Amino acid sequence: MDGGLCFDSWSDYLGLSSLISRGLQPRGEGENPSPRWNVSCPAPAEPLPSKEPEGRGYKGCGFCRSNKEAMSLYSSHRLRSLDGRVLCPVLRGYTCPLCGANGDWAHTMRYCPLRQLLRNPQSPRNGQ
């Protein structure tokens, strides 16, 4: 069989391994920890909490709760502020290995806007 005409499932055609490796490299001192790509963050994955955190239905931080943290921890804070910034101290300390986001705009790989763009590229069709 012709080696040049076959699809090799083990080949990294898009160069994603080097992209991820660059995202996993430690940053130097004084280097800005902001994302390396110009990707705007989408709306929060979870609905924003009401202004009254103790209101009916409030269950605390969804991130900590889903990671099975103690109730005393997850009920002590909200995941996001009303303007969408991350409040959870655990998530704020996490850095996305794909885009480098952390702090106010921290997210896990599952909610990374870069991952979502790679999964659903919105390229123009038929030259439009």
Swiss-Prot record:
Where is this protein found? Cytoplasm; Cytoplasm, Perinuclear region
The ranges of region (Disordered) come to: 23-56
Gene3D superfamilies attached here? Nanos, RNA-binding domain (4.10.60.30)
Q: Where is this region: Essential for its translational repressor activity?
A: 7-23
Highest rank taxon of the organism: Eukaryota
Segments forming a coiled coil:
none
Q: Binding of Zn(2+) 1: at which residues?
A: C61, C64, H77, C88
Instruction: Write out the function statement from the record.
Output: Acts as a translational repressor. Can mediate repression affecting different steps in the translation process: cap-driven, IRES-driven, polyadenylated RNAs or nonpolyadenylated RNAs. Essential for the development of primordial germ cells (PGCs) by ensuring their proper migration and survival.
Q: How are the domains described in the entry?
A: The Nanos-type zinc finger is composed of two C2HC motifs, each motif binding one molecule of zinc. It is essential for the translation repression activity of the protein.
Protein name per UniProt:
Nanos homolog 1
Q: Which organism is it from?
A: Xenopus borealis
